[in-house]
Amino acid sequence: MDGLMTAVVKQYHKEGADIVKKEIPKIGPDEVLIKVKATSICGTDVHIYVWNEWAKSRIKPPKTMGHEFVGEVVEIGENVTSVKVGDLVSAETHIVCGKCRACRTGNAHICENTLILGVDTDGAFAEYIKVPESNVWINDKNIPLEILSIQEPLGNAVHTVFSGDVVGKSVAVIGCGPIGMMAIPLLKRTGAAAIFAIEPADYRRELAHKLGATRVINPLREDVVSIIKSETEGYGADVVLDFSGNPTAIRQGLEYIAKGGRMSILGLPDNEVPIDITNNVVFKGITIQGITGRRMYDTWYTVKGLLKSGLAEDLKPIITHTFPLTEYQKGMELMIKGQCGKVVLYP
């Protein structure tokens, strides 16, 4: 397909991004061209926009931003057989090699040669995006576009929540950004006994309560450890899920986690996190898990089933703002201030 399209591009090594006109991507024999119908803003996009230290070390401008999306297939390569023009699709954002040890042992989500849409390759903040056929996920057309556009981060939440048992457990959710928020209805739907949402932003605490948290805690004003201990008969939380990457919050989590408990960490700390391994890990007999992305493609099938069973309706309050793609800056500002849930853009 020839022609120009509108895209949000990180053009320079500095804060911000630009709306530009650029050529519609040309696909190869194993690729698919997708017309983007909706795309959502991720925390990674914010990092790239504000140009933090991670972005400076990873991003090579010019780069079209964005990686969470839903769209319609408009062109397929000559070797493509599993996708057809007209399919409503999203995409796994980790483009993997399929040849390294991780890929060959069922751990493609931690492929040693991963490329990420909107980070290493041009992304979805555009009218069109190209992706490998192997990354395309065919959607259920009965699910709203806004919900389909957030399946990638929802997959992160699903991977984190279900990396262990949560049924009948007391669960602490650290950080109620969009992915942390998604964990709450997941936990509620699957039978967690208590859900503690730990979040400093007033807006997000209110939304966490609306989504089903049994107790919301402001860590800047309340004693998180005492509250969780007192509401779990002194035992502590069976499961601690960190979506914040905040070193203080992670250390606190190790204080209020129950003996034999599980901590799963998706959040990315900016600095090293000193912890008391002897008393809070070894003597407590806990398990600490690092979570990266989505298990490919187990997590996607789980997401599909959950959305079909009613989770799509549960998630609607998380999408708090929508804008045309050309007004992406409004969404970025809301994300930076923590005054939103999920922000969806329409090209």
UniProtKB/Swiss-Prot annotation:
It is an enzyme of class 1 (oxidoreductase). The keyword Membrane does not apply. Belongs to the zinc-containing alcohol dehydrogenase family. Binds 2 Zn(2+) ions per subunit. Keywords: Cytoplasm, Metal-binding, NAD, Oxidoreductase, Zinc. Pathway: Amino-acid degradation; L-threonine degradation via oxydo-reductase pathway; glycine from L-threonine: step 1/2. Zn(2+) 2 binds at C97, C100, C103, C111. The active site is at T44, H47. GO terms for biological process: L-threonine catabolic process to glycine. GO terms for cellular component: cytoplasm. Pfam families: ADH_N, ADH_zinc_N. The gene is tdh. NAD(+) binds at I179, E199, R204, L266, G267, L268, I291, T292. This is L-threonine 3-dehydrogenase. Homotetramer. Its cofactor is Zn(2+). It comes from Caldanaerobacter subterraneus subsp. tengcongensis (strain DSM 15242 / JCM 11007 / NBRC 100824 / MB4) (Thermoanaerobacter tengcongensis).
